[in-house]
Amino acid sequence: MGQKTNPNGLRLGIIRTWESQWCVNDKEIPNLIKEDFLIRKLINNFTKKSAISQIDIERLKEKNKNRITISVHTAKPGVIIGKDGDTRNKLVAKLKELTQKDVNLNVLEVKNSDKNALLIAQNMAEQLENRMFFRRVQKMAIQKALKAGAKGVKTLISGRLGGAEIARSEGHAEGRVPLHTLRADIDYAAVEAHTTYGVLGIKVWIFHGEVLPGQTILDTRKPFASQSSNTPNRRPRNFKGGNNNHVNAKKN
């Protein structure tokens, strides 16, 4: 069932950790879940073009429950920080107004955006909205990820592809993407692209490598790690959604 589940959720507690970390009484859980949702929504809407890949929220100190530490991972930290930190200060003020708590905001740079599934999916959505051909969009994204050091990449686009009357799904994959291997560090993201023909769904899977005993997920996601020479060279393959029977891609 590794093909059907969300790879991020399937690996929680094994090689991945939670983006929201706090320990409270059962009665407080619903309120904090809602608060985390509103915090992420506010940050994403406040800085729409800042290429945010992840937002971590921590409430770890029981003695100081009114303090929240928020870490924003972005490929464009300058957009969030702003000139002399003006944009960051405005964002902190809005977060304090929303939560009525003391907020500590950390802005962390994503050093290699070509290996991040969410940033790749967002970039693909932007290109599709600009009417670029969907097959070219997939191949360009895959080539960039492999060049950046990914061990394998798989993409899937669903909807009215090319303006067709009947919606369908079409994907492209290169390298290894072992969805059934729980120690495999697989980054997954799903994004929507709003085009003139309707909404297209975009899914991206990126295999960074296997997390062996004594290692962490950070060891497989170094800023740049060239592909191992032991990795078998597999031919690119196209496939259609809902069908796991891969078809060899035609040679150009």
Swiss-Prot record:
Binds the lower part of the 30S subunit head. Binds mRNA in the 70S ribosome, positioning it for translation. GO terms for molecular function: mRNA binding; rRNA binding; structural constituent of ribosome. Keywords: Ribonucleoprotein, Ribosomal protein, RNA-binding, rRNA-binding. Belongs to the universal ribosomal protein uS3 family. Residues 241-252 have a biased composition (Polar residues). NCBIfam families: rpsC_bact. It comes from Phytoplasma sp. (strain PY1). PANTHER family: 30S/40S RIBOSOMAL PROTEIN S3, SMALL RIBOSOMAL SUBUNIT PROTEIN US3C. Part of the 30S ribosomal subunit. Forms a tight complex with proteins S10 and S14. SMART domains: KH. This is Small ribosomal subunit protein uS3. InterPro entries: KH_dom, KH_dom-like_a/b, KH_dom_type_2, KH_sf_prok-type, Ribosomal_S3_C_sf, Ribosomal_uS3_bac-typ, Ribosomal_uS3_C, Ribosomal_uS3_CS. The keyword Ribonucleoprotein applies. Residues 39-111 form the KH type-2 domain. Gene3D superfamilies: 3.30.300.20, Ribosomal protein S3, C-terminal domain (3.30.1140.32).
